[in-house]
Amino acid sequence: MSRCSRPAPGDSSRLRALPTASDPARILGDMTIQRMDNVGIVVDDLDAAVAFFTELGMELEGRMPTEGAWAGNVVGLRGMRSEIAMMRVPDAPGRLELAKYHTPTAITPKPEITPANTLGLHRVMFAVDDIEDTLARLRPHGAELVGEVTRYEDSYLLCYLRGPSGIILALAEQLS
């Protein structure tokens, strides 16, 4: 039986165990994931996006131009030229790569402001200490609630908001 074929019904001799707490990175045989490194978001104003996510509490790890054959080959856009800003969550694993495309310019989806059930990247959620304070700090940077701040049982206050370039973010405040 090849590695890709299914075992006969009842034959468990070739089945591999699911990852366990003692081996969390093992997935599908020898293929592994070490970690989720970052989420990439295309923006139309890199400075505004950096200011927004800095106000949210992220730290700017660095900014750099991205261009050349290697970059175009990776993303499938020959002759591309962009600038990226890598933002990180302090003292936690989690980074956002904000990218401003100069060549070719970014494509605006139609409709420009898509609803929450649009296929593709849905949203990025951040746990915050105080949801109302966070919203108050983000509003001057263009943040707008999508719905309303809502209590989920006795566990969380939750909301969706739009940030720079129409990015949907979710905020979650854990209730004690």
What do these predicted regions represent?
Residues 24-50, 56-64, 120-128, 172-176:
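N-terminal beta-strand motif that seeds the catalytic metal site of vicinal oxygen chelate
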Residues 42-93, 133, 140, 159-162:
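Core segments of cupin and vicinal oxygen chelate
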Residues 15-18, 28:
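Leucine-biased recognition of intrinsically disordered, low-complexity hydrophobic segments
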Residues 154-156:
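Short, small/polar residue-rich loop motifs at catalytic or cofactor-binding pockets
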